[in-house]
Amino acid sequence: MLRPERMSKVSVTGSKAVMDDVVETVHGLNLLDVTEYDGSWEGFDPGDPAAGAEESSGRLVTVRALESILDLDANDAGPTRIVTDDALDEELSEIQDRVNGLDDRRKELESEIRAIDDDLDTIEPFRDLGIDLDLLSGYDTLEVAVGTGDRSAVEAALDGAAAIDAYEVFTGSDTLGIFARPAADADADVLDDVLVGANFTAIEIPDAEGSPEEYADKREHERDRLESELDTVDAELESEKTDAAGFLLAAEEKLSIDVQRTEAPLSFATTDNAFIAEGWIPSEEFLEFEAAIEDAVGERVEIEELERARFSADGTDHVREDVPAEPGGSGGEVGSPAAADGGAAEARADGGSPVVMDDDEPPTVQDNPGVVKPFEVLVEAVSRPSYREFDPTIVLFLTFPAFFGFMIGDLGYGIVYAAIGYFLYTNFEDRPAFRSMGGVTLAAGIFTAIFGILYGEIFGLHLIATYLWEGVVGLAHAPIEKGLSPAGVDWARGWLVVSVLVGIFHLNVAWLFGFIEDLELHDLEHAVYENGSWLLMMNGLWVWVFSDALAGVAPEFIYTTFTADGVLPLGFAGFPTMALFTIPVVDAPFTLPLLVFLIGFVLLAVGEPIEAIEFLNVLVNVLSYTRIAAVLLAKAGMAFTVNLLFFGVYVTESGADAEWHFGLGHMPEVGTMSSGHEVTEILFGGLVHGSAATILVGVLVLVIGHLLVLALGVTSAGLQAVRLEYVEFFNKFFDGGGREYEPFGYDRQFTTED
């Protein structure tokens, strides 16, 4: 789980006479992540596409264009089918003619309808003007302009124009119609020239007759006819979609497979008579891979497991592990050219020695069990893990839901989150990202419900505490509390301490991962300087903080939270002082934890001097985890406020012993007894205890308030938990940048070969 699946570099070398059979077999196995040949070997060239590649590519483009026209998706497919070349020749051509013809007609109709809509938009000013369209054009001695503008400005411009002998202006609500008789010696289009400076915007006069209303009615009737015809064409296309969907989807799949197979030689190193193909496969699949090819072509190819990617102390990202020959197998020894030492590879097509095309990074196949796999989406949101580093998915699986559940901690909210997650997980099987987020949400909801039971809360009400922990189990209160009321303030302080301890543990794991990675990739020196130093500093500092050396200086609750009388009675009251000597100037003990911190700082300064200025990160990063307690109290406070407004809250006892209670059944008066305690104060009477109107308002407040708390739980608890994982945890060891495993093959969905 912490390491990706082991990958092996394999080579397939053989005669071109069997290349097509090898390609078909390898494609069917869907195992080989092919390494692209870069043309660097003398005497070897990238292969040429097989016969039919161009034809298949052209057909594939045609099929996808038809699918786009018909708006097909995977849900439109019928049962799987066999698609033959003859069917492609005949049926595809017929479908193409019908669909393209209908699509052309649809586009033509849509264009005509758009033109009519433009005409109708244009005719509106003329309807406002109220003059027949045939009266607005066709004159020999008059010029006409229609548009919008300021009438007084237009008339002033016309009055001052010597080139205009006479004019008349007609007006509608927003439209002006101007009829002008130019002088005998005036230039053509003189009216347009006069109106240029008159704040007038001209509108093109349509070439039509009759009133604007008649013209608009005629065009609307024409549009109705075209829309009816368009509906008919759409119905024919929908019918064509129903009839052709299964064939087109299956044809696309077959042609995609054909294109993959025929273009595969482009990645091979070839001569006139031989080929070499290389790539990565999961190591445990090599025997199956080898056997399948040998069954297909016999001994006319040489199949070798050239190397296995592993970790080592040679300073490289990954190195090659020699593969011992299998008894009876064809795997050969890896010569020095195939190692990761930069040796030159001698390219031979006779299988005499293994050949490495490229010292490429192995693809990363995350090796996580089913229940953990949805959390890969959170890791890949940052980056796919590199093959050389730990996959932190399992850690996110163990910590993210716990962080989230602890911060929300409510059975009601947990059930809702779990239901949402279950819905996403079960209804989006064809959308892996949504399905994975559903799995994450489901886990977060389960932990929220578990912590809600421990807190004794359901939608912010302490009903579980009352009826389960106090009524059935017989406890005085729930096993743990959030600490909102004055009587429970020690819990709130205790959660701050717990948050710090969680941060220390979480960061220890992160730097241990980094330590192991540096140890495997480099050496002990790198591991100690880059990660061991931080481990020493962080643990030294926080052991010192939790030791008696700071007693009387640090807050008392740091030492009392876990004492026998504390809220979490584990019997821990702090570490001993562990003094080594007294510092003369400040008269304070220099302790063993401080020495450990100092050693870590010196190691960091020697190994990574630039990072030494960030030594306080061991304090800051850990304190960042107190956001867990902060969000816990904030979310609890929001739910408490919503319930306070609806049910009301009364107080029993006073001062540091004061406890808050919701008025679920009724609101007692001050001075009366409730559950054996005197009511000392009413914080709020509660909308539910008022009139019918306040009850209605209260119901709205209750529903909307809890929905808001539910939504903000994602944006607060969810984002804060993710931030702790990404910023505090990942930054200590995770680089990412891994390559996705893309095997040569196809997962058939619409076709079958049988």
Predicted regions and their residues:
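Long, charged N-terminal accessory/stalk domains
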Residues: 1-391
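Conserved, carboxylate-rich catalytic/transport cores that coordinate ions
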Residues: 1-8, 15-30, 34, 293-295, ...
